[in-house]
Each structure stands twice: as structure tokens, then as C-alpha cells.
């Protein structure tokens, strides 16, 4: 149990996918202008990352390794992610049409989110078992969602702040992301791997 807690804390805070590994920057910058959109994208990404992580582990363990097809790992994981995203899109469309309209093009773009593929590949490279893969996928998604929501809240405040003209828009957003990354560096000694 302690191992899973350390994996969770380490993935969410110490090795955050957005601020440390720089994966998932496209939705991080694109969907974080409004808090409600960031929360919706965070929830959708959490569902996709967790499910894709587990499915990718199963495809690798039960199909690719026994058949000696490990060279098809990236292609197989992309196909798994595409299926999971399509399933998620159907669920979101049926359960919350308003959220589906808010997320717009970003929901299908989860397929090309490098964080999702990165989690799947890192699970295999770090030799995680089934449960560790599920925890790692959920933790990566929780870290992604946490950073997204924090960043969206800051960007909403910056939208009404008196920011100098040269720094308005994406300039102040990048500066804010850099400062958030520095703040998360404070968690570096929290968990030793």
C-alpha cells in the first residue's frame, strides 16, 4: 500500500507530466483559459489516461510480448488510445452535452496528446505490473488535472489583471507556467525513487 501511495505522490507532485516531463502541453495551454473547461478536460483526460494505461499494459503483456511483436508497441498503443478516446467521447456526449460542446475539438485531440502515449510507454519501460500501471495512469492524470485547474484559475485572474501590453496573452501564460514549474520543484525531495 505504501508503494502505491509513494507512486501516486511521486507522479502527481514530484514528476508531474506537464511541469517536469513537458508532456501534454497542447491541452495545457489550449484548454486552460476557462476553469470549467479545464475541469472537464481534466476529468476526461483522467478517465482516458487511467483506462488507456491499463489497456496498453494488457495489450503489451497478453498480445505483444507472447507473439514477439514488441516492435509494434507504439502503433498498438496509439490504436488502444484511439479506441479509449472514442469510447470516452461517446460517454461524454451522452452524459453531458454541454461539456461535450465546451471541450469541442480538444476531446478527440486527447488521442494525439503525448501525455497519454507517454504514460503507456513509461509504464512498460518502468516494468510496472497491472496495479502499478493503473495507479501510475491515474496519478499522471491527477497531476495533469491538478496543474490544469490551477493554471486555469490563475489565467482567469490574469485576464482581468492589469498586465503590461507586451506580456498579454500567451506571454504571461508561459511565464506563469514557468513559475508553476518552479513551485513544483519544491516537491523534489518529497519522494525518492
UniProtKB/Swiss-Prot annotation:
Its main location: membrane. InterPro entries: Ion_transpt_RnfA/RsxA, NqrDE/RnfAE, NqrDE/RnfAE_oxidrdctase. One of its GO terms (biological process) is electron transport chain. Its EC number is 7.-.-.-. GO terms for cellular component: plasma membrane. The complex is composed of six subunits: RnfA, RnfB, RnfC, RnfD, RnfE and RnfG. Part of a membrane-bound complex that couples electron transfer with translocation of ions across the membrane. This is Ion-translocating oxidoreductase complex subunit A. The gene is rnfA.
Amino acid at each position: 500500500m505504501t508503494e502505491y501511495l509513494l507512486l501516486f505522490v511521486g507522479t502527481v507532485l514530484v514528476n508531474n507530466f506537464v511541469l517536469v516531463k513537458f508532456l501534454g502541453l497542447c491541452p495545457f495551454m489550449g484548454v486552460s483559459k476557462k476553469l470549467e473547461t479545464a475541469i472537464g478536460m481534466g476529468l476526461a483526460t483522467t478517465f482516458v489516461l487511467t483506462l488507456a494505461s491499463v489497456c496498453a499494459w494488457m495489450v503489451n503483456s497478453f498480445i505483444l510480448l507472447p507473439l514477439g511483436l514488441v516492435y509494434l508497441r507504439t502503433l498498438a498503443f496509439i490504436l488502444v488510445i484511439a479506441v479509449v478516446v472514442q469510447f470516452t467521447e461517446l460517454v461524454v456526449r451522452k452524459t453531458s452535452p454541454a461539456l461535450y460542446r465546451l471541450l469541442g475539438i480538444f476531446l478527440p485531440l486527447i488521442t494525439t496528446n503525448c501525455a497519454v502515449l507517454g504514460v503507456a510507454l513509461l509504464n512498460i519501460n518502468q516494468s510496472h505490473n497491472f496495479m502499478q500501471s493503473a495507479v501510475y495512469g491515474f496519478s499522471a492524470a491527477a497531476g495533469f488535472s491538478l496543474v490544469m485547474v490551477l493554471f486555469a484559475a490563475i489565467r482567469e485572474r490574469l485576464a482581468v489583471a492589469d498586465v503590461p501590453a507586451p506580456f498579454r496573452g500567451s506571454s504571461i501564460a508561459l511565464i506563469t507556467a514557468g513559475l508553476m514549474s518552479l513551485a513544483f520543484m519544491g516537491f523534489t525531495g518529497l519522494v525518492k525513487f
